[in-house]
Each structure stands twice: as structure tokens, then as C-alpha cells.
């Protein structure tokens, strides 16, 4: 719960205890042996300490928008760039207390295309732990636009007898 008032926490604890009365017994649901508990947190290489200035984000989005709107059939675009950095702390009653950091960089492009018969929308995105691994803005925008344009003026498929493999 995000409500950390004492009254609310007491109610939450009571509800949790009450819920356990309806839980069937499970011989495999127990605390692990102490020798199985973690003693350290390994570095999983999930954190990029790169700092992205707002000007860099704006430049990336401008390139993304330019590539996404390059075809005259594209009538609208929406692009975004987000950056997230988190800290996780793990602790137990045996004295273990350690943590790790994660980061993510995400860019997306949504495009709307129109022709004389239809209007369609599609998107593409890239989400990576490391900024350097994020897809190129131009490629991402072009991919979103191409996917959207391919959906325009769909053709009906006629009935036919075909083999189905299960």
C-alpha cells in the first residue's frame, strides 16, 4: 500500500493474516534454509550512468519525427523519449542488505497514415538498459511509418480451401 498511516497498516496486516486462513497448506511453501540465502548481489550490468541532456533528447526526437513524417501519406506523428533510473534494496532478517541499480532508455514513434480509402495507425519503439544500444532515431521513425503505410487499403482475401497444421 502507498498509504503508510498506522491505522491503514494495521488494517492491511489484519487482512493479510485473515487471507492466510483461506490458503491451503503447501509443504513446499516455506522459508528457505539459511545456507540457500543470498550472501551478495552480483553485478548484472543493468545500469548505465550516462546522463542525457534535454538538448540531446530534443535532437533525438526531432530526427525521429523527421524520419516518421517523411512520406506524404503520414498525416500525424507522436514521439516520446523516456529515461528511468532505479535503485533496488534487498534485505532479510539474517542481516543481508544489498542492492543494485537499473536504467532504461525508451523511445517510441506512433504514426497515422491516410490514403483515399483508409486511415491506419501503428508504432515502433526501442527500449534498452544502455543509451548507446537504443535504436537510431531515423531508423525507428522510418520503421513506424513503413509499418503504418503497409496497413493502408487492405485487400480482402477470398475464401479458399487450405491445409491447416495443428
Regions flagged by a language model, labelled:
Residues 1-166:
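Active-site bordering "gate/hinge" segments
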Amino acid at each position: 500500500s502507498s498509504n503508510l498511516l498506522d491505522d491503514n497498516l494495521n488494517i492491511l496486516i489484519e487482512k493479510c493474516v485473515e487471507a492466510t486462513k483461506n490458503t491451503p497448506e503447501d509443504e513446499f511453501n516455506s522459508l528457505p534454509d539459511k545456507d540457500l540465502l543470498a550472501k551478495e548481489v552480483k553485478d548484472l550490468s543493468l545500469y548505465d550512468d550516462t546522463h542525457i541532456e534535454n538538448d540531446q533528447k530534443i535532437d533525438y526526437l526531432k530526427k525521429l519525427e523527421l524520419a516518421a513524417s517523411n512520406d506524404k501519406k503520414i498525416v500525424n506523428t507522436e514521439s516520446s523519449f523516456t529515461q528511468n533510473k532505479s535503485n533496488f534494496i534487498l534485505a532479510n532478517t539474517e542481516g543481508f542488505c544489498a542492492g543494485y541499480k537499473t536504467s532504461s532508455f525508451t523511445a517510441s514513434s506512433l504514426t497515422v497514415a491516410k490514403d483515399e480509402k483508409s486511415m491506419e495507425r501503428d508504432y515502433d519503439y526501442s527500449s534498452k538498459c544502455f543509451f548507446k544500444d537504443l535504436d537510431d532515431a531515423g531508423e525507428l521513425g522510418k520503421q513506424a511509418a513503413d509499418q503504418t503505410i503497409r496497413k493502408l487499403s487492405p485487400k480482402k482475401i477470398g475464401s479458399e480451401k487450405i491445409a491447416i497444421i495443428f
